[in-house]
Amino acid sequence: MKLVPALSLFSLVPIALVGCTAPASPRADGGTALVLADGYELGNYNPVAGFGEAGEAKVYDGLVRLSGGRDSGIPALEPALAAEMPVPDADAKVWTVRIRDGVRFTDGTPFGPEDVVATYRAILDPASASPLATSYDMLESVQATGPDTVEFRLAYPYSPWPTKLLLGIAPSEQLTGGLAEQSPLNSAPVGTGPYELVSLRADQAVYEANEDYWDGAPQVKRLTVVYVPDDNARAQRMASGELDGANLPPLLANTFADRDGYEVVANTSADWRGVTLPADNPVTADPAMRTALNLAVDRGAMVESILAGHGRAASTPVPEVYGDAYEPSAVFPFDRVRAEQILSDAGWVPGPDGVRVRDGAGAEFTVMYFPQDTLRRDLSQAFASDASKIGVRVNVEAVDRSVFPDQLTAKAGLLGGGDLPYDPDTQLYSTLHSSYARPGVGSGYDNASNYVNSRIDRALDDARRSVDAAARAADYRAVQTAYVADPGYVMLVFLDHTYVVRDSDWTGRAPILEPHSHGVGWGPWWNLREWTRP
């Protein structure tokens, strides 16, 4: 057994503890059940409230679903509850979907066009207060136009509309109005998916295979997900042999790399980590400070030391996976000397304690992170260390998720993004467009810097409304070029999501580009319905 070197002082102790545990022992069930540990809270299973927006919900199906097998590049979409891929009119403003026949929800009721209509209308209904409403602002109306046909009418051309059809469909009978967050679907979901939730506690959810699933009953018959929010605790329970798999940050995952009976799985993602630069904070709002901080961070060192090589440096929210829409020149080099010069030229001069000062105010601000997220903690501390080397004092503070968004106007936050990365529009729009800087628009994490850049707004809007692939790609390259000239965040890294699994004879795993979410709904288990064994 070989221990991975302690690449970060912040993670030294948990690595050593996990590395010295015993090899994996055989699971008692040895059959068709899996037990996984997740760091995300259980519940909130209503698609109208945003659950499974990227198509990962095992209790629901969308009209389309992701097709795996590509660990780089945008995955293809294929019909799910749609009988065939949606068909647009000439300007991509009207999309017609023929739905699949003979499908039933797990409560026994038949699936039909009325369920599709009810789900999407609920998102648009102000009474639902759906967090998805803003991201569906292109949807003008949805109606059934026949016994097996649904028509979506859009306010403007939107060529990536099929990505919006990954959302799970709920029965119309369950969508009776009122706040989405108060719907019974949050704790008792009813869908057409390959699994059915049979019990739910705060610390455990149990799913059983839907034996009447329209695409064939899954061979994994029972899935238990236990909620373990602490990274180190998940690693310890994984090492004890009580779990079949868990999501773990890279340094902890790597401690299992040379252990008998375990495998470390890394999936490419468009999930970024970065530091917000609040427009209402006089230090982080300064354009010179924003540029200097972007030049001062050693992203390569973060990838190697904190991600253990499982990731890539990020200067903008756009990863290389977008091909022609990616602008390779839009990067911030690591240049501490230039960063210091920019600050000096802008009037930020070193004070007696080494912290720069301008007009009597010190170059000091706070970066928040979620207390139980060791990866965000380590990145926050590395960012603070790099900033200190150019005379900027960054205080690092653990802040509970429940109050985190409310403090983002005054304090910076170590955030992640890439919730729906299957088109550049959904990767970028809510992060950079100024419409999300307005109070009450989107979630508290959308455009969390309150960033406003008219050039970027125009390019994002032009790309969103274009049906020409080459023109869209050019617009997105223009977004990146404009962004590095006037950054609104300090983007740090794109993650490879890391997981640990116990050896087994199950086959069928398929790599896929993952979104920001990386609980056990993704990883090796995203396509659990397809797993087979000899």
At which residue positions do the language-model features occur?
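Detector for C-terminal structural segments
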Residues: 28-29, 297-326, 375-384, 405-534
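N-terminal lobe/hinge region of extracytoplasmic solute-binding protein
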Residues: 37-90, 121, 190
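Gly/Pro-rich hinge or "lid" segments in bacterial periplasmic/extracellular proteins
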Residues: 67-72, 166-218, 222, 336, ...
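Aromatic- and charge-enriched surface segment that lines or borders ligand/interaction sites
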Residues: 84-128, 151, 283-285
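Surface-exposed binding/hinge segments that line
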Residues: 98, 132-175
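Ligand-site clamp/hinge motif
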Residues: 183, 210-256, 393-395
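Append "and occasionally in soluble cytosolic enzymes with long acidic Gly/Pro-rich linkers
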Residues: 285-382, 533
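Ligand/substrate-recognition segments at binding pockets and active sites
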Residues: 349-421
